[in-house]
Amino acid sequence: MDLAVSNEDSQILLKDKNVLQETVLDKYRTSGQITQTALKFVTDLINDVYHYKKVQTPLSISELCLMADSFIVNRLEQYYKHKVNERGIALPTMIDVDAVASGWCPEVDDTENIKKWNNNSDETSPFASSITGYLRHGDVVKISLGCHIDGYTSQVTHTMVIYPTDETNTKPTGPLLGSKADAVAASHIASESVTALLACSLTPEKLPQSLRNANTNSVTGHQIRSVVDTIAKAYNCAVVPGSRVRRIRRFLAGQNEGIVAEKDYKGVVWTEAHQEANLLANTEVQDIVVANNQNKLVASSAIPSDDFSVDVGEVYLIDLKFCPLTDCQKKGLITLETVDSYTGKSHKKNQLIARSGAYVRDYAQSYTLKLKTARQLLTKIDKNGVYPLKLSHLSTDFPLTEFTAEESDAVKKDLRSFRLGMNEITNNFLCVETPIQVAKWVPWDHILNSTNKNGALSYDASAALTLPGHEIPLPKLGISGIKLKSLMNSTNEVMTLPVARECSTVILCGSDVSVSGKPELFRLTGGSKTAQPSWVHSARELNPADPVVQGIFNLAELSKDKRFGLTMRETQPMKKNINLASDTTMEM
């Protein structure tokens, strides 16, 4: 939805406040340092509980999320106090396991509900860890979190593997093998390659020859897509829809995609439509009817396109998700299924049932609420700003300081009163649930052979967070979102696939603001020191004969060359951390 904003305000919000200068860079740097420290805090907790066995009582996923969010808020209290109007959590801590691609951040009072809703699932379910709330050996765990200071945002996602260990031997006996290893390796290599490619925009003369455009030396969206797709193909993986490499600006970090049409959107996104385009480009069948669906209601600058150049002084979010195709015996579509908590319908045995834990405020909607609890809750939500939030963040006992059971029980008590008010708020679209999404594989022959009477006229009202111009998943075939959802439930060939994900935030600093006095890429989050890749072994490798792969190898060499290569700097986590003792764990 387009908001009525004057040209003067638009100039201030989108241009003036995003000029990279010392004050802005310091806010980015501080938020990145807090995010890096929070990521290390969560990974250390998981290692202490599941690998080193230092904590006697295991911590559940909901407990880890609450503790990480509390850690971020406690850290933010130490910086820019009384100096900025807004600071806080930009992305609630999400711990997605295996096939859950994004959005898994359950509240502490939902642990038993999730078990009850999924009582027909067993240990063989791909969602067993998410349902029980505890991680298991072999799980591919994606940790996502972020914070902001005055709207300048840093986000991170890191994939780690849970290895089998015991008290006598805390080191894993071997690396992760198989299709999951392919996805983990591909996500790490792609993230590092795109980071190096963005760094080449600062010194275009260092851009590898095989990656150069015919007319210009600048880094474009087409090059970014080519590099990522080449790595995915080499590791027999698919880029999961929702992956993106996009520019972020003050208060515009991708959290409101689909709610507000962002002017001058700049980034590469991967959707089902790109898989459809590849299918039609490689097919020899001539009797497939394709449509020309164009959304004329949305400004063209708000629709993502690869036709852009990366410029100095911009901030980019690199968010890439991969799933392996080893178990897929024929061509198919990788799509995302939104999880819901409707218990009145018939569910398949291994279908996940859960309710969203995070919400986004839609300021374009207005409604006079009837319930007093809903009005009071909306007042608290409006103070939170434009970023996603959880109900636990609104509790008077949040953030937790000692991580005790008493603090957790106090948060649970507040949640009970909040849920009634949130029902009226969401029913009137004042807030939108952040969806929990699961990666699914659907065979193409099932899609092409299906009847589609309504074509693209059907509309999925539940798909609230959809990018402008991508409301129809398969526009050429005329397959709408609601039709694709029905196709996933109408065949037993549909498969659930594990997902690996890496996300980092980078700044392209010019010589006027860089520490070294020359252009450099400043990596706010991620990196080899804080987000060290897990021990995996993939049987696949990049093909050196491919010109794009040669460019990827050149990017890796430039990243390692400290003298003549690319100038890149990483934000380091804070040295002081919170150590969780076994006697201070929350018992729920």
From Swiss-Prot:
This is Probable metalloprotease ARX1. Keywords: Cytoplasm, Hydrolase, Metal-binding, Metalloprotease, Nucleus, Protease. Belongs to the peptidase M24 family. One of its GO terms (cellular component) is nucleoplasm. GO terms for biological process: proteolysis; ribosomal large subunit export from nucleus. SUPFAM superfamilies: Creatinase/aminopeptidase. The keyword Lyase does not apply. It comes from Candida glabrata (strain ATCC 2001 / BCRC 20586 / JCM 3761 / NBRC 0622 / NRRL Y-65 / CBS 138).
